[in-house]
Each structure stands twice: as C-alpha cells, then as structure tokens.
C-alpha cells in the first residue's frame, strides 16, 4: 500500500500553480475561400488593416489590399504552393518592412530584403517600413549640389542635382539602362550610396548588370534589388518601395544616395494585373484609378534634406519605356508630370549611331540648372540651343538645294558638336574632361577638323590633358570654375592637339 504524503502533494500543487501561464494569446484568423493568380480571397480577419502583412499556413506572406464587406482580398508574395481553399490565414499586426544598413551594400536582394546572391545572410538588425511618408516641406531644401553622371551631354545640357527626380524615357533598346549604370559607375569615390531596382527584367540581364558593376568596382557601394519577370506581381509592385526604403536609411544619416527604378512601366503593369484580379474598377488603358498615386508617393520620397535634418539626399532616376516614341500615353505623361525633368532617348538617333541617343530638343532638367558647376555652366550655355537649331536646320536642309554660308557653317558646327558628345558605354568622364571637350566644340576651335576625326580628336585631347596637364584637371576638379588662366591653357592645348592631328591627316 502506497502511503500518500500530504507535504509532497502540497509541493506539487504549489509548483503547478507557480508554473501556470495565464496569458491569453488572441490572434485574428481567417480562412481562404478562393486562391489563384497570386490573389487570395479570405473570409474572417475582421480586425485586419489595409496594407497589413498576413501569414498563411505554409509560411507564405501576403498583403491585405481589398477590405470588402464579407471578405478580404490579399496578394501573395511567393509561390504559395501549400495554400489551398480552407487554409488558415493569420494577421500579423505588422506592415511590410525591409532590412537596411551598411551591410546591404554589395548585395543583391529580393523585394523583401532577402539575399539572392548566394553569399549568406545579411548581418544587419536595422529595419525600415517599405511604405514610408515622404519628407515634408520644412524638412527639405532646394536642389543645389550636382549629381555628376559622367555623360557629357547630360552634365552639360540636362544637369541633374542631388535630390532631383529625373526621368529617363525612351523606346526599348535605346540605352536607358546604360545611362543609369554609367551614372552608378561615375559615383565611385564620391561617397554616394547607389540602389539599383530591377523590375520585371530577365534574370540574365540583372546578372549581367551585377557583373558589370563588380568589374568596375561599383558594386561595393551599390545595393541591387531584383524582382525578376518570373516573380509574382506583388513583388514587382513592392520592389521600388523597397529600394526607396534602403536608400532612405542612408539619406537620413546625412549621406547622398542615388536610386534607379528600372523600370516603372513594368511596376505599373504588375499593379494593373493585381488590381484587375482584385476586381477593382479599371480606368484609362485598364489601369486602376490610383496608378498616379502609385508613382507619386514613390518619387516624392526623393529629396534634398535641410541641414537640420542632416543634409542627406536621395536622387531618383526612374526609367519609363515608351511604345514607338509615344510620350503621350498614360504612364509616361503621369511620370513626366511628377518628375523634375526628363531625358528623352530617340530610337532614330540610336540607330543613326549617336550614343547616348539623347533628343536634346525635348529633354529638359527643371531644377538641375541651380546645381550645375560653374565651369560647365559657363561654356555649355549655348550648346543646347545650337544642337536644337542644328536638328531643325538638318531637317530643313534636306529639302533646300542652295544654303547660305551662315547656315552651312551652323550645320558644320552642329555635326562636330554631335560627334563630340558621342560616348562609349561604361566610360564616364570627369568634370575637367567634359569642360575641355565642350569648350573645343562651342568655341569653334575644331571647325577645321574633319567630322569623321572629331571623336578621335576628343580622345587625344583627353589623353594629352591626363599626361601633360594633370594640374589643369586637378585645378578644375578642385575649384569647379574655369578662370581666365585655365581658359588660356585649355585653348593652347586644344590648338596644339589639333595642329598635330591635322599634320598627320
């Protein structure tokens, strides 16, 4: 017979009372009614908020977008192969956030901030909301510092300033991404953090861009966010906001940042797909009514912060793809109206051999003039006008048989200016090299050089300056001004290079 010991029973009861966990966990749970095409209809989730993160049974995450009377429409951020009708869904009470910080530089991540480059986890504990309010008026100051792209035609005629939104627009295969990549490469040594967002692109293209950046030492200060063509529409829609959040972290630390959205046409198409599947009413070109807000809330996050806020900046270069040069379509006109200017790339100019194929006549920078360096502003003032007039005269001269001497001279000057502005890919020029090249063309110092030799002349001029006049380059890079002494030196060098070149022709 086992004896019952009261003290033992008492201690067991006390232990159980002590260990009793009386906390109650309340979770907001729903049931999947319907699933397909990356969209789930969920019954329940009465307490869910718009934009709240949801967690499905198999670990897939989603975002609640449509809050209707009897169900919730959510988009899935993954394949969701384990989700089916009747699956449980839990609201998390959180809004989508992404890891940020120094450790992100040099990495390739997906729109959720997860690494996809095979280099392991990213050692950072900082996070930031993907959707963040843009800085208010008081927190900003006007654009006043240059963001050098290294591309002469842009820095001279369509200058971009830190904190500006400059649209790159053109048909497919006209060199839009090339301009963006060149701009990233040109930030080497400038203490600028770059974020390249690839939306709906082929994985091979993104891998190629990453390799180009690595070869040129630009990946060290760049974060690549990739939502490939095979990714769900929800991830393609989120990718630009993720890029903006990563850049914002550095901007609020007082750093200069550059974000490239390549391209926002595909983001709008992904959003249209999601909206139509969620049965939102379609508008023009079947886009939903809030597609303008989709891009405006993204691009308004680019800013030049006031000194009180640390003086950081986020420069945005959104890219838009047009169909047969039609800039009056819905998305192009929306983004043109949001941004501070546009660089228009022409397929005709591209096919005629002009690279970068910038159409100077309809390209403009609305605020960049205030940020342009004095050295290039002084000499490039007439360049845009001369090239625009040349384009008109060139079209007119095809129909006119006898042209007066002044018109012929203007045509010849225009041909040489256009040749001077040709620039191979991945070879950005510094300020001093740009000043030298533009000065030679605008001042008419190369009018005697044959048109076919102008590109060769520009290369020789840059080489001569590097080898024999390094102090000229250093002075311009330091002072950012072209004084009378430097101008005399430059004129002398140009004439010397021209004479030696003409002697061998």
Swiss-Prot record:
PROSITE patterns: ATPASE_ALPHA_BETA
Its membrane topology: Peripheral membrane protein
Record-level GO cellular component terms: plasma membrane-derived thylakoid membrane; proton-transporting ATP synthase complex
Binding site for ATP: 170-177
Residues with site note (Required for activity): 363
Keyword tags: ATP synthesis, ATP-binding, CF(1), Hydrogen ion transport, Ion transport, Membrane, Nucleotide-binding, Thylakoid, Translocase, Transport
UniProt EC number: 7.1.2.2
Enzymatic reactions: ATP + H2O + 4 H(+)(in) = ADP + phosphate + 5 H(+)(out)
Principal subcellular localization: membrane
Top-level taxonomic group: Bacteria
Annotated localization: Cellular thylakoid membrane
InterPro entries cross-referenced by the UniProt entry: ATP_synth_asu-like_sf, ATP_synth_asu_C, ATP_synth_asu_C_sf, ATP_synth_F1_a_nt-bd_dom, ATP_synth_F1_asu, ATPase_a/bsu_AS, ATPase_F1/V1/A1_a/bsu_N, ATPase_F1/V1/A1_a/bsu_N_sf
SUPFAM superfamilies (UniProt xref): C-terminal domain of alpha and beta subunits of F1 ATP synthase, N-terminal domain of alpha and beta subunits of F1 ATP synthase, P-loop containing nucleoside triphosphate hydrolases
Spans through the membrane: none
Function: Produces ATP from ADP in the presence of a proton gradient across the membrane. The alpha chain is a regulatory subunit.
Family to which this protein belongs: Belongs to the ATPase alpha/beta chains family.
Summary of subunit composition and partner proteins: F-type ATPases have 2 components, CF(1) - the catalytic core - and CF(0) - the membrane proton channel. CF(1) has five subunits: alpha(3), beta(3), gamma(1), delta(1), epsilon(1). CF(0) has four main subunits: a(1), b(1), b'(1) and c(9-12).
Annotated HAMAP family: ATP_synth_alpha_bact (MF_01346)
Name of the featured protein: ATP synthase subunit alpha
Native species: Prochlorococcus marinus (strain AS9601)
């Amino acid at each position: 017979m086992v004896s019952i010991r009261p003290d033992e029973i008492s201690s067991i009861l006390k232990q159980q009372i002590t260990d009793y966990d009386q906390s109650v966990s309340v979770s907001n749970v729903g049931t999947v009614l319907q699933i397909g095409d990356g969209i789930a209809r969920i019954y329940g989730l009465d307490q869910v908020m718009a934009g709240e993160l949801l967690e499905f049974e198999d670990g897939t995450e989603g975002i609640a977008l449509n809050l209707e009377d009897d169900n919730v429409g959510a988009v899935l951020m993954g394949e969701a192969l384990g989700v089916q009708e009747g699956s449980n869904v839990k609201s998390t009470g959180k809004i989508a956030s992404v890891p940020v910080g120094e450790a992100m530089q040099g990495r390739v991540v997906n729109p959720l901030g997860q690494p996809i480059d095979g280099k392991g986890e990213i050692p950072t504990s900082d996070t930031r909301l993907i959707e963040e309010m843009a800085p208010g008026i008081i927190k900003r100051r006007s654009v006043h510092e240059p963001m050098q792209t290294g591309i002469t035609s842009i820095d001279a005629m369509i200058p971009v300033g830190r904190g500006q939104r400059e649209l790159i627009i053109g048909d497919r295969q006209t060199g839009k991404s090339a301009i963006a990549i060149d701009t990233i490469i040109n930030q080497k040594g400038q203490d600028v953090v770059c974020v390249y967002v690839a939306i709906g692109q082929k994985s091979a293209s993104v891998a190629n861009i990453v390799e180009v950046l690595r070869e040129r030492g630009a990946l060290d200060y760049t974060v690549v966010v990739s939502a490939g063509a095979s990714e769900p529409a929800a991830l393609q829609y989120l990718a630009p906001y993720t890029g903006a959040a990563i850049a914002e972290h550095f901007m609020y630390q007082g750093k200069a940042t550059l974000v490239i959205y390549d391209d926002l046409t595909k983001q709008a198409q992904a959003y249209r797909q999601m909206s139509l599947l969620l049965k939102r009413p379609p508008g023009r070109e079947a886009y939903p009514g809030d597609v303008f807000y989709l891009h405006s809330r993204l691009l308004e996050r680019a800013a030049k912060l006031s000194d009180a806020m640390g003086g950081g900046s986020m420069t945005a270069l959104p890219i838009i793809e047009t169909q047969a040069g039609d800039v009056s379509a819905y998305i192009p006109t929306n983004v043109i109206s949001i941004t501070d200017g546009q660089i228009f790339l022409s397929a005709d100019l591209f096919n005629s051999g002009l690279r970068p194929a910038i159409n100077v006549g309809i390209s403009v920078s609305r605020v960049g003039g205030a940020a342009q360096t004095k050295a290039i502003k002084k000499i490039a003032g007439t360049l845009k006008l001369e090239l625009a007039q040349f384009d008109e005269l060139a079209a007119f001269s095809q129909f006119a048989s006898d042209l007066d001497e002044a018109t012929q001279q203007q045509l010849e000057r225009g041909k040489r200016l256009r040749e001077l502005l040709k620039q191979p890919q991945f070879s950005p020029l510094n300020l001093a090299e740009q000043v030298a090249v533009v000065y030679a063309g605008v001042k008419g110092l190369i009018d005697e050089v044959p048109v076919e030799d102008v590109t060769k002349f520009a290369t020789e001029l840059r080489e001569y300056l590097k080898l024999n006049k390094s102090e000229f380059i250093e002075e311009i890079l330091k002072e950012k001004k072209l004084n009378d002494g430097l101008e005399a030196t430059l004129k002398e060098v140009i004439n010397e290079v021209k004479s030696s070149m003409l002697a061998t022709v």
